Amino acid sequence: MISMNPIMIRNNLSRSSSPAAPPTTNHSSTVDYFSIKPKLSLDINSQSDSNSTQSNNNEDTHSEQSDYNSYTHNQYYDSDDDEDDFDIRDQLLDPFDKITLSNCNEEYYSPLTPFDGQTTSPQDSIISSKSSNKSTTVVPSPQFQLTLPKLTTYSFLIVDDNIINLKILNRILLKLFPKCHIVQIQDSKLVKDLLHKQSFDSIFIDIEMPDVNGIDIAQFVRQDTKFDNMGMVAVTTRNSTQDLELFKQCGIDFTFHKPLNYSLDFMANSIDDIIITRKNKI
């Protein structure tokens, strides 16, 4: 009989009580990470695609619902706005339905469409201008005239006891002859001495002045042949036939009546004619 020590008996019992381990198979040679990686990638991509599709479907559904709500909302409020616009337009246009045209030849026409009120109506003129492609030639009004200043270097003497009249005539002469030289005298007693010291192309005199009036100055000028080439113009309120005849006898060449409501062309041409006529007499 074989004797066993306690240590051997304990080892045998532990071996007999533990289950048998299954046989192990080494797969390291056939299955690894690189062989299963493509499959894992396909599974992950397919899962993300399905999630994205579901999310897009949800967004499309929500967008369609929002568009429908927005459309119904806008349609409702647009109809209200249209009704308000029609009400405002009716309020503005209703008063004009009761207006009747009067004096259409003077009032009812386009300012850009010229027409002759004696030969055609403004309505016909407007219609014809719309249907016609030809340019309309606008005839300028005979009352409109362009006045060009004269650049002659005249020398003028103005004599008037009223300072306002002096300034008015001075301004007019400068408009007519921008290069002219003008001397103004308010004291008529100084005229004789000035005429002996300085020569002028023309002298403008007021008739009614204290001490030495315009008639006195005219007689003094025409008595001296030295001043035969100088024009003399009366600027006065006296315009009766007797006064004009008296002025002519005293040697006054022309008379402008106060106030000076003359066209600039008329005054410039009259002064030019007076000076030229006087100079040609020498």
Curated annotation (Swiss-Prot):
Compositionally biased region (Low complexity): 12-30, 45-58, 125-139
Domain Response regulatory positions: 155-273
GO cellular component, one term: cytoplasm
CDD domains: REC_hyHK_CKI1_RcsC-like (cd17546)
Region annotation (Disordered) ranges: 12-31, 43-84, 112-139
Alphabetical keyword list: Phosphoprotein
Residue ranges with Polar residues bias: 66-77
KW Glycosyltransferase (keyword) present: no
Protein name per UniProt: Stress response regulator protein 1
Organism (species): Candida albicans (strain SC5314 / ATCC MYA-2876) (Yeast)
